[in-house]
Amino acid sequence: MANLKGGTFEKQLKDAFHRLEAFGVGRVGKNDNLTHSDKLAEKREMYLKDVTNYFKSENLTDKLNILFTKENLDKFFSQRLENLSSKTQENYLRGFSSMLQGLEQKNIYIPLHFEDKSFFDDRVKIIKDEADTIIENRYINNAKEVIKNLYEIREISGLIAQTQYELSIRQAEAFELVRNPLKYLDNGFVSDLVGKGNHKYEQKEISFELEQKLLNNQSSLIDKSTYYNDLQKFSISSHDFRFTSARDKFEEKIKNGITEKEAKLQISRELNHKREAITDYYLKRTK
């Protein structure tokens, strides 16, 4: 199997786009994943630009198709699909999957297809399961006890959950911190952690206990679906830790005499936002 042609992402993107083109080619009796319409061409151009921009933001430099690994795409989709409706997420995943199948049909090497053939089906299943569950209150009662129980089920799941809860961060950001602790940890602080929209978090203090756990972790990182399944044992989702953390830290600040307005602004910055309204949203979902 071959790689995409071109010495830059832009040239490889164009090569991928042209390989998929099949305008005017009849589909009767065929079952391919090529581009037969202008509408599909527009979507695939968007997919390719989205993932190319993500790879650039991560300073990845290999051939575009070689970067289509399970690890890279898992991180890309976690960032790209966040806060989209379940139907939009599902359509995006199905469209992207079809595009990769089309490239493989044109003899382009796609690592993901050798690593995990059910990658897209598993992700869509998770989205559908979550969509079927209407979550009003995102607060986790006894969050620390839940985290303790997660450690007993699978140590790495407990570590990811504790990292999310103590630092008020998203699942994708916790995965990155667990994966590369030396890149971000510096004498009791987390620095340069990048969140949604490529925005860096303000420097965060981290407990000595959690810092040592991250630095000394020997467990292999799991994928999102495994973490999801572990959390399902407690009927919670990964983002619930961020909601719960925001509520707990807000109440702690109020107890310490900080005004409500200032506490909300501080929590918003903890969440990597800059608006009081963001904290209001988190508090409304954790009553």
Model regions and ranges:
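Basic, Lys/Arg- and aromatic-enriched nucleic-acid-binding interface segment
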Residues: I140-I169
